């Protein structure tokens, strides 16, 4: 029996996933969480074999949950089910140890089969997304990504410098590097492009 925990912030999707998986004779849904923090508590309580999670949720994101599971060396496999068909998200998910990455518009039977594959130690990745992920690498380094994310959220260079304990000039350099690497005219365009690609 594969013991599964669901993490999904949309109640209707959460209910549909639970109902779908409960139809399978070899899968048991232990519970479902509406956000990342609740999912982390449920992980510690239920100790599932597999976590099926959305990527964007309040509290902790699905990626942050996967990273936390990896950091704590928990024997839990992770499958992300999302609407985000962005190669950058897939690359970050794989870096976080995720075993499966499926799009919500995939056929329903794909989820149960992916669960079995990932539970056995395999990978279940949307094939088209995998091709795109390998063809276009994220040009930003961690610090450029961090500074660009904060700038895109509306923070000034001075605010970012204070928050990250950097000089104002260093923040401006990181922003200039990110803008140059992405081939955009300004930080807003750079932020939008990086979000669109899934690099932020």
Regions found by a protein language model. Give the residues of each.
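Conserved acidic carboxylate
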Residues: 8-10
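Acidic, metal-coordinating helix/loop segments flanking the phosphotransfer/catalytic sites
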Residues: 32-50
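Acidic catalytic/metal-coordinating carboxylates
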Residues: 35-38, 58-64
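Short amphipathic alpha-helix used as the core "switch/output" element in two-component signaling
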Residues: 41, 63-75
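Two-component signal transduction core modules
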Residues: 51, 78, 101-102
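Active-site residues of response regulator receiver
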Residues: 54, 82
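Short, flexible helix-to-coil linker/hinge segments that flank and couple to helix-turn-helix
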Residues: 88-145
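Recognition helix of helix-turn-helix DNA-binding domains
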Residues: 156-189
């Amino acid at each position: 029996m594969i013991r599964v925990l669901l993490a999904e912030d949309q109640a209707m999707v959460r209910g549909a996933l639970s109902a779908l998986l409960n139809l399978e004779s070899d899968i048991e849904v232990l519970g479902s969480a509406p956000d990342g923090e609740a999912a982390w508590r449920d992980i510690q309580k239920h100790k599932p074999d597999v976590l099926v999670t959305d990527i964007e949720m309040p509290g902790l994101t699905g990626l942050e949950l996967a990273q936390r599971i990896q950091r704590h060396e928990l024997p839990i496999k992770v499958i992300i089910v999302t609407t985000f068909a962005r190669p950058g998200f897939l690359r970050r998910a794989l870096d976080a140890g995720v075993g499966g990455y499926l799009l919500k518009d995939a056929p329903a039977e794909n989820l149960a089969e992916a669960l079995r594959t990932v539970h056995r130690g395999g990978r279940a990745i949307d094939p088209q997304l995998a091709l795109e992920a390998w063809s276009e690498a994220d040009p930003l380094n961690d610090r450029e990504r961090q500074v660009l994310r904060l700038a895109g959220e509306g923070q000034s260079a001075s605010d970012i410098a204070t928050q990250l304990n950097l000089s104002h000039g260093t923040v401006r350099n990181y922003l200039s590097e990110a803008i140059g690497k992405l081939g955009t005219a300004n930080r807003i365009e750079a932020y939008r492009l990086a979000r669109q690609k899934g690099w932020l």
